[in-house]
Amino acid sequence: MRRIAVTGAAGRMGKTLIEAVQQTGGVAGLTAAIDRPDSTLVGADAGELAAIGRLGVPLTGDVARAVDEFDVLIDFTHPSVTLKNLDVCRRAGKAMVIGTTGFSPEEKERLAAAAREIPIVFAANFSVGVNLCLKLLDTAARVLGDDVDIEIIEAHHRHKVDAPSGTALRMGEVVAEALGRDLQKVAVYGREGQTGARPRETIGFATVRAGDVVGDHTVLFAADGERVEITHKASSRMTFAKGAVRAALWLDEKPAGLYDMQDVLGLI
């Protein structure tokens, strides 16, 4: 049995991950659940927190104390928290599945450095559907080339703290790479006032934060006379949780390295 730990276990995504781990039919099991050290829920049963029944796994506030209890840590938290957990896992030789978004380029370099010592799956989105969309976006960009205007529109719930979403940025990276462009130079994040005519080479991003939207992403390829839209809409966090658990199982026996969901799904 693959021993899995979940950090951020008392949050919305953490609870969903706990449920997803327990749906593997015994292939994997939750052996540790971690949240903030100051959480009033420390000591509570992880299964009861996730409303799936008692599991006998108490919530702890310290990854280091639980590090001997798991083979792989699934982390959907905050960059600062993830990087602390990364240091613990690197020293202990534990694998990680990272779904945290909002990393700076320098922080991503720290992930890459740690991946020289431990296996890590790092992805902006663990949905199978989104990763299929990334493959389709690469194809669409190469076929449509420089004859289209490209816009990326994403929507999430009011509680999401980073914008644009990591998934939207990854979509932009895929499209830019396919077209031989540098996303940092061509990205336009929102528009206001007298912007002038739209330069063809730019890739625009528009962000919506409202209600309880789990995650909607649309990439628009607009030409004169026609347009192509590639859209993914998530209706449940379980979509991401199942993908993360799939990645955790896939990492078994994998050598050190930085992988993503394209590797897990065999799309590369």
Curated annotation (Swiss-Prot):
Pfam families referenced in this protein's UniProt entry, alphabetically: DapB_C, DapB_N
Alphabetized UniProt keyword annotations: Amino-acid biosynthesis, Cytoplasm, Diaminopimelate biosynthesis, Lysine biosynthesis, NAD, NADP, Oxidoreductase
Subcellular location: Cytoplasm
Active site: residue positions: 156, 160
Known catalytic reactions: (S)-2,3,4,5-tetrahydrodipicolinate + NAD(+) + H2O = (2S,4S)-4-hydroxy-2,3,4,5-tetrahydrodipicolinate + NADH + H(+); (S)-2,3,4,5-tetrahydrodipicolinate + NADP(+) + H2O = (2S,4S)-4-hydroxy-2,3,4,5-tetrahydrodipicolinate + NADPH + H(+)
Domain of life of the native organism: Bacteria
GO aspect biological process, one term: lysine biosynthetic process via diaminopimelate
Binding-site residues for NADP(+), renumbered to this chain: 36
PROSITE patterns assigned to the protein according to its UniProt record, in alphabetical order: DAPB (PS01298)
Cellular-component GO terms for this entry: cytosol
EC number: 1.17.1.8
InterPro entries: DapB_C, DapB_N, DapB_N_CS, DHDPR_bac, NAD(P)-bd_dom_sf
Signal peptide span: none
Pathway annotation from the record: Amino-acid biosynthesis; L-lysine biosynthesis via DAP pathway; (S)-tetrahydrodipicolinate from L-aspartate: step 4/4
UniProt-listed Gene3D superfamilies: Dihydrodipicolinate Reductase, domain 2 (3.30.360.10), NAD(P)-binding Rossmann-like Domain (3.40.50.720)
Binding site for NAD(+): 8-13, 35, 99-101, 123-126
Molecular function terms from GO: 4-hydroxy-tetrahydrodipicolinate reductase; NAD binding; NADP binding; oxidoreductase activity, acting on CH or CH2 groups, NAD or NADP as acceptor
Record's function text: Catalyzes the conversion of 4-hydroxy-tetrahydrodipicolinate (HTPA) to tetrahydrodipicolinate.
HAMAP family linked to this entry: DapB
Family in the record: Belongs to the DapB family.
Name of the molecule in the record: 4-hydroxy-tetrahydrodipicolinate reductase
UniProt organism field: Stutzerimonas stutzeri (strain A1501)
High-level lineage: Bacteria, Pseudomonadati, Pseudomonadota, Gammaproteobacteria, Pseudomonadales
Gene giving rise to this polypeptide: dapB
